Amino acid sequence: MKISRRFTKAGKGPYAQIKWEKRISEIRNPDGRVVFRMDDVIVPSTWSQIATDIIAQKYFRKAGVDPSKAELWRAFVPADQQVLAGPPPREGSEHDARQVFHRLAYTWLLWGKKAGYFDSED
């Protein structure tokens, strides 16, 4: 299978064109009490607060992130954005949308390689 490059440029990481920012995600009961809160959630700056809440509350792994794989996504973060990423605030938990994107893309890549779907490494 051949997949044409569409949204990235050769030699640049997939996140180079995206501006990122830290946010807070909360769930509140009808009475106003906070039942979930995650600080320092990093998402694309163009995302709505609802999109931020969905990824933080539904898609971030809260525990069990393999330490040997947890930081692999950082290799794709441009140098000028490394400061924003910072260290993970919670051990074993995802806090950055790039971690989710990398986890999913890497899984699909491994499945595709195993099934022989790709014509080349590129």
Residue ranges and their predicted role:
Residues M1-D122:
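Extended catalytic cores of very large enzyme megasubunits
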